[in-house]
């Protein structure tokens, strides 16, 4: 069986669904969208209810559930590396935090030769194009894009307000919009949730516009085995359907667009013969193109929680009890409101821990309950927690193919915490978080410190806690980086160096990880490259102002030292 299309997109995730939707706006263009997972079932509360965000990480229906190799600086732990599977990709299972990164992240990208048009003011129009913010558009936010963004509302949990106020009392700025003029500081956090209280994954936002188009073919349960080449030109894809072993071939008249994410995109390229030649030869894979950067430069965000008991019964601890969940579910299902309609990450912040950082190097997410991100080990009392993590670790990892079997997971190593800077940032971060939590705004609520615990104070004690308890924020990226140096995989339009008709468009092409969650930026990148693929003029540069700290101190005088 063989089919022919103008474009074949491999992976219906945050980037692939954007490309599929935008490319098929041109009626004379045909697109095949291949997704290894299944549909994004709208009746499955696990992926549709924002408060149920821990559920899709459990099991393998929606999660590839990768694991790292033993991480040498983390007590040789094999660490989780969850990635989304199904229409929507990781936007179907993520925490729904709508954070774009710092303006200076993109200005930093634009300093690289060939990436000059990735500055913040070049990217901002595409962030706006993708977004519909529920309180309306402005210079920073869109009003008619496919991604629904919900802002925190008056009357939400008092712990959110107390935690933001504590950050301000600790001497840090207040910001009304973490995606607006100033990211630095503490404030409300937007979320990718529809006005009806449903998860706003890219299957809902983008694909729902495009599903009925005759020029779009979507195949689920289609695991791409390898890209097919004629010389150095990509001409198609061989893929497996369901549990079958008989490959199906599809041909691409124009381009193959790899949108499989930071783990699977380099894995697919390597399996197809594009990657480090020595690795490919070891696996008896014919080398189509020796490209040493494929799978290198792997980056992620690591985070840990500081947990506190809550003296007042205002946390969402009761919602973790099964006997309260039917009422919460019914309110969400029928009214689109209540606890179920929020991811419960409604406040957060970004700070600089030292003057050496030009823009924030630590991110906070505040949660009005004390529980693990994956829903396990909930503290059996009212509590709250701060998720704290460093943003631009100097540690670099890699993805290596283990075999030619498309169903075998690759070897993944992030080399977490492999630099002294990592340890310094996490020690600073824990100590500064404790200072924030000790401010008067939290006096009515703050009970004892549950984790790490007051007995964990010295550098050595903190380091041991970090080694044992830090975990991924699920932000793998940069493993097929954009650029022009010897380790770059793609150019500024996602075109694979040395190849024709082949692009990578997803979080793997970020040259450096951004300051914040990745989903919004991945969508923006796909919007931007979609215009390039279609031969359209880029959107005009924004003229919006944005904050640069310059000589501003990292913090003012705290209320309580």
UniProtKB/Swiss-Prot annotation:
Swiss-Prot/TrEMBL keywords: FAD, Flavoprotein, NAD, Oxidoreductase
Catalytic activity: choline + A = betaine aldehyde + AH2; betaine aldehyde + NAD(+) + H2O = glycine betaine + NADH + 2 H(+)
Amino-acid positions noted as binding FAD in the UniProt annotation, renumbered to this chain: 6-35
Record EC number: 1.1.99.1, 1.2.1.8
Cofactor(s), by name: FAD
Highest taxon of source: Bacteria
Enzyme class: oxidoreductase
Catalytic residues, chain numbering: 475
Pfam families assigned: GMC_oxred_C, GMC_oxred_N
One Gene Ontology molecular-function label: betaine-aldehyde dehydrogenase (NAD+) activity
GO biological process, one term: glycine betaine biosynthetic process from choline
One Gene Ontology term, aspect cellular component: membrane
Pathway: Amine and polyamine biosynthesis; betaine biosynthesis via choline pathway; betaine aldehyde from choline (cytochrome c reductase route): step 1/1
HAMAP family, per the entry: Choline_dehydrogen
Similarity comment: Belongs to the GMC oxidoreductase family.
Function according to Swiss-Prot or TrEMBL: Involved in the biosynthesis of the osmoprotectant glycine betaine. Catalyzes the oxidation of choline to betaine aldehyde and betaine aldehyde to glycine betaine at the same rate.
Protein name: Oxygen-dependent choline dehydrogenase
Provenance organism: Pseudomonas paraeruginosa (strain DSM 24068 / PA7) (Pseudomonas aeruginosa (strain PA7))
